[in-house]
Regions:
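Gram-negative outer-membrane beta-barrel transporters
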Residues: 86-89, 111-192
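Extracytoplasmic loops and strand-loop junctions of Gram-negative outer membrane beta-barrel proteins
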Residues: 1, 47-56, 66, 103-110, ...
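Hydrophobic, lipid-facing positions within transmembrane beta-strands of outer-membrane proteins
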Residues: 11-17, 54, 64-68, 119-123, ...
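Residue-level signature of outer-membrane beta-barrel architecture
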Residues: 9, 19-21, 34, 60, ...
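Signature of Gram-negative outer-membrane beta-barrel scaffolds
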Residues: 1-23, 38, 136, 151
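Membrane-embedded beta-barrel scaffold of Gram-negative outer-membrane proteins
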Residues: 18-22, 27-29, 59-119, 128, ...
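Outer-membrane beta-barrel translocator domains and adjoining extracellular loop/strand segments
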Residues: 7-13, 41-49, 54, 93-102, ...
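Transmembrane beta-barrel strands of outer-membrane/channel proteins
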Residues: 1-3, 30-34, 43, 70, ...
Length: 192
């Protein structure tokens, strides 16, 4: 339970489940949780307008998440891989908007109407041929839905049901971690 002097009170919960099979190399797992994000000082108080009294009241974003996954380790190959499904939804998302005031327009942060949804699949693999080096290859597919029930103020066009901005549909990560005895750690990471 958290209390915020401007944005109200919020609580969050999480439940998890995991089962390790008898071979000790296979696991299924799942979780469900709720969460929130209080507005930052910038989001609460920044307004670009001729009238500085146009600061709006904002409340916390709320989220619900669910995931289920499968993990397998192949000891003969020193290979670990996972497959996961995730589903998230957000309400009262904090966004910057142009609003009308008695003295004209103002750009400020408001809670967006509608529900923003995100779901996808994640595949993770790690190969550890020895104690000094390992290789990770991850792929994530994300489908998002912008549930706002209003127009984009910058383009005056509807963006309901649109893919979220700055959320890639396809994401691939390649990572190499090298830990020789004379170095603490050396990493190479490639994101596409």
């Amino acid at each position: 339970f958290d209390e915020h002097s401007f944005a109200g009170n919020e609580d969050s919960h999480r439940v998890t489940f995991a089962y390790l099979f008898d071979d000790k190399n296979t696991k299924i797992k799942s979780s469900y949780g709720t969460g929130f994000r209080f507005p930052s000082l910038y989001e609460m108080f920044f307004v670009y307008a001729s009238n500085s009294n146009s600061i709006g009241h904002v409340k916390a974003e709320n989220s619900k998440s669910f995931d289920v996954g499968f993990e397998k380790f192949l000891p003969d190959l020193d290979l670990n891989f996972e497959a996961n499904y995730f589903n998230l939804s957000y309400d009262d998302v904090l966004e910057g908007w142009k609003t009308g005031t008695s003295s004209g327009s103002a750009y400020t942060t408001q809670n967006m109407p509608g529900t923003v949804k995100s779901q996808g699949l994640e595949f993770i693999s790690r190969w550890m041929p020895n104690n000094y080096i390992d290789f990770d290859l991850n792929y994530t597919y994300t489908s998002t839905y912008d549930g706002a029930e209003q127009d984009d103020p910058d383009k005056n066009s509807s963006y309901t049901n649109a893919q979220m901005v700055r959320v890639p549909r396809h994401l691939i990560n390649l990572k190499t971690n090298f830990s020789p005895s004379n170095f603490k750690n050396l990493n190479f990471i490639l994101n596409t």
